[in-house]
């Protein structure tokens, strides 16, 4: 059975008031994400070891294997993008509340300290990649990954991500990655999704 592109969890124009145009999703979701799905299906076609496997299974199975780098890169990018869409929400951003805020304050000292550290991780990821909030051995941590890599390969639980590939922000912010990061933290973070991941 072929892998399928997950639907956007919002209308393509739903985030325009928060700084992300429908055109961004036309290209980012409609072309980039779709291409990863199409490429993955071509690469695993006829390979019995991938039959019935989830994206997470494929990512873990192929991580670090140079002979299967194409499969890993496309599978991870399919997963990363689906996770990223769910990390976005109209009228999102700002500080979380309740138990999640308590955990962030315990791990980073304050929400503002978390925000500063996350923004720095996203801004300093050289070239293409992702910034993440993860749970690692019961502790919240911020990490970043290059290209298609993701925390699943390190046994970490992803809670939140921000895509810092240039195609993620060039339509809306041109080359101003820091502005894109600040806008995400202030207006777009889906804390309900983060809380659900933490509780899972």
Predicted regions and their residues:
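Feature for soluble, non-membrane regions of globular proteins
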Residues: 1-200
């Amino acid at each position: 059975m072929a892998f399928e592109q997950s639907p956007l969890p919002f209308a393509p124009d739903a985030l325009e008031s928060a700084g992300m145009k429908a055109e961004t999703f036309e290209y980012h979701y409609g072309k980039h994400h779709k291409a990863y799905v199409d490429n993955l299906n071509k690469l695993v076609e006829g390979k019995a070891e991938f039959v019935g496997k989830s994206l997470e299974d494929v990512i873990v199975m192929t991580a670090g294997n140079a002979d299967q780098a194409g499969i890993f890169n496309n599978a991870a990018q399919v997963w990363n993008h689906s996770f990223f869409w769910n990390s976005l929400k109209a009228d999102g951003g700002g500080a979380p509340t309740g138990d999640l805020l308590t955990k962030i304050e315990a791990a980073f000292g304050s929400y503002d300290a978390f925000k500063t550290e996350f923004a720095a991780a996203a801004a300093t990821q050289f070239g293409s990649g992702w910034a993440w909030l993860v749970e690692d051995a019961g502790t919240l941590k911020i990490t970043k990954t290059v290209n298609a890599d993701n925390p699943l390969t390190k046994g970490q639980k992803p809670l939140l991500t921000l895509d810092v590939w240039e195609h993620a922000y060039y339509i809306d912010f041109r080359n101003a990655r820091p502005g894109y990061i600040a806008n995400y933290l202030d207006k777009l973070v889906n804390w309900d999704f983060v809380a659900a991941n933490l509780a899972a």
